[in-house]
Amino acid sequence: METLKIIIPTDFSVQAEFAYLMVQRLEEKTAIDIHFLHVLNVPDTVTLDSAGNIQTCGEIDVNYVTKQKDIAERKLANLKVLYGDHINTHLVLGKTTDAILKFTESNHFDLIVMGTKGASGLKEKLSGSETQIIARKSKTPLLSLMCDRSDLQIRNILLVHNFSQPAKENLVLMQKLIKAFDPKMHLLQITSGSVDAEKAKVEAQMIQFAELNGISNFQCHLINDKDVENGVVHFNQMINMDIVCIGTHGKGGLFHQSATEKLINHLFKPIISFHLNN
C-alpha cells in the first residue's frame, strides 16, 4: 500500500481538528504519514539557534517570543496525547503562509490539508484568505474544508477542468485516491456557449484526457453557466459530489485561479486544488 505524506498546518483551532478528522477518513483506505505544523508568526529577524533558543535583533522581546514558543510546544505535545504517537509535530518561525509553503516543499509532502473558516474567518490565524494564498502558490495539492467531514464517503469525485487541450497532468494524488477508494470520477467543463453545439467535441476531449491520465471509471458533464464558480455550485446541487478537484494555473487573471479561491471560501465541500501543467 502506497503511503500518503500529509501535512496539516495547525493554529490549534476547531478547523484544524476538522482537517485531522478528514485525514483520518483517508487513513481508513490508505497508509498515511501525518505531520502537524505550527508556525510562530514572527518577522524574519527572529530565528532559532542550533540549541533551539530564540535569537532576535531587538525589535521584539525575546522573553515574549520564548513564552509563545513554549505554549505552542505544549499544544503540539498535547496533539500526540490526543491523536497518538504516530503523528509528527513541527514548530517553525516565520510568516504563516511563506513558512507553510517552504516547509511543505522542502519536505516533499503529497498533500496539504487545511481547515478554514471561509470568508468570515479573517480573525483566525489560518483564515480563508491564507488558505487561498496556499492554493495559489503551493506546488503541492491542497485539500481545504470548512466543516466536519468525518462522516464522508468518497464515492464521487468531481474534476473541474477546461479539456480543450487534453494532456497528461500531474495527478499523482488523484491516482492514489482512485486506487484507495475506487470512486467514480466526474469530468466537468463549464461553458458560456451552447451545450448542444459543443457536447460531442468536449466529450471526445474528456475521453482523451481520461486515457492520457489513466482514468477508467468516469462520466462526462458539460453545463452552461456564467462562470466556473457558479457552474460548480449548480452542478453540486444537481449531483452531489463528495470531493471537488479544481486546477489552478497559479497566474493572475485566469478564471480557474479565482474560481478555486472563491470556492474555498463558499463551497461546503472538501476541495482539492492543484497546479496544472499548462
Tell me the role of every PLM-derived stretch.
Residues R25-E28, V81, E105-S106, R136, ...:
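Solvent-exposed polar/charged
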Residues Q24, A77, Q132, Q175, ...:
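Active-site phosphate/pyrophosphate- and oxyanion-stabilizing loops and adjacent acidic/basic residues
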Residues S127-E130, K201-Q205, F255-K262:
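Charged helix-capping and loop-helix junction motifs
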Residues M1-C57, N156-Q219, M241, H266:
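Small/aliphatic-rich secondary-structure junction motif
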Residues Q55-I71:
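A short acidic, glycine-rich active-site loop
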Residues M1-E2, N41, N78-I112, N213-V244, ...:
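Structural beta-alpha unit
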Residues V113-T116, P141-C147, G247, I271-L276:
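Short beta-strand elements of ligand-binding domains
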Residues I112-K139:
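Helix-enriched interaction subdomains in cytosolic or periplasmic regions
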